[in-house]
């Protein structure tokens, strides 16, 4: 008789727990149905992109600091030079199968050309598809820093302006006049 009462009590307790948990909010997130904005934290470091400056030209000056800062060596690029003396990457390649999304390349970039986006859907069936070229990485906008232009701040001569006339640039200093 005790075993029968214990069995019935166990069944009643189980049903009670099931019906009380049915109305609770789920802990598991159903990813495809839930928008990505609700899943990804605000400072999530996802896919890497190359941005353009406000004038529409690519920001990357092929300084190679991102490749040096990368702890796993997944970034490779080759420098080329335009007629006006501006450097640009002839090719820029990131192997996302090796990337650990640490953000060191973004911190090392002096022109803010490399930026991390909250995009996390990078799954591919073929490993070679995880190697992104410059054409895949380059976006049409300036990204997080819409007003920043490296060449306005860096002091490179701009067509139509003399040295010292660019934005936030002081006039050149004559060092000889400072000597005694």
Swiss-Prot record:
Keyword 4Fe-4S carried by entry: yes
Primary localisation category: membrane
Cysteines engaged in disulfide bonds, as pairs: none
Residues involved in [4Fe-4S] cluster 1 binding: 60, 63, 66, 109
Cofactor binding description: Binds 2 [4Fe-4S] clusters per subunit.
Binding residue positions for [4Fe-4S] cluster 2: 70, 99, 102, 105
Pfam families membership: Fer4_7 (PF12838)
Gene3D superfamilies: 3.30.70.3270
Cofactor requirement: [4Fe-4S] cluster
Top-level division of the source organism's lineage: Bacteria
Similarity-based family: Belongs to the complex I 23 kDa subunit family.
Its job: NDH-1 shuttles electrons from NADH, via FMN and iron-sulfur (Fe-S) centers, to quinones in the respiratory chain. The immediate electron acceptor for the enzyme in this species is believed to be ubiquinone. Couples the redox reaction to proton translocation (for every two electrons transferred, four hydrogen ions are translocated across the cytoplasmic membrane), and thus conserves the redox energy in a proton gradient.
Record's protein name: NADH-quinone oxidoreductase subunit I
Native organism: Acinetobacter baylyi (strain ATCC 33305 / BD413 / ADP1)
């Amino acid at each position: 008789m005790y075993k029968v009462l214990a069995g019935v009590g166990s069944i009643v307790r189980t049903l009670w727990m099931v019906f009380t948990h049915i109305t609770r909010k789920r802990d598991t997130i159903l990813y495809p149905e839930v928008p990505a904005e609700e899943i990804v934290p605000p400072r999530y470091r996802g896919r890497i992109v190359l941005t353009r400056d406000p004038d529409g030209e690519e920001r990357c000056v092929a300084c190679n600091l991102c490749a040096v800062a990368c702890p796993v060596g997944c970034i490779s690029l080759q420098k080329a030079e335009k007629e006006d003396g501006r450097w640009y990457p002839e090719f820029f390649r990131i192997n996302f199968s090796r990337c650990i999304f640490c953000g060191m390349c973004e911190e090392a970039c002096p022109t803010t050309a490399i930026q991390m986006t909250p995009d996390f859907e990078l799954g591919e069936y073929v490993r070679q598809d995880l190697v992104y070229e410059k054409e895949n990485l380059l976006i049409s906008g300036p990204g997080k820093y819409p007003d920043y232009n490296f060449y306005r701040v860096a002091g490179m001569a701009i067509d139509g302006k003399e040295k010292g006339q660019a934005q936030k640039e002081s006039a050149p200093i004559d060092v000889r006049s400072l000597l005694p």
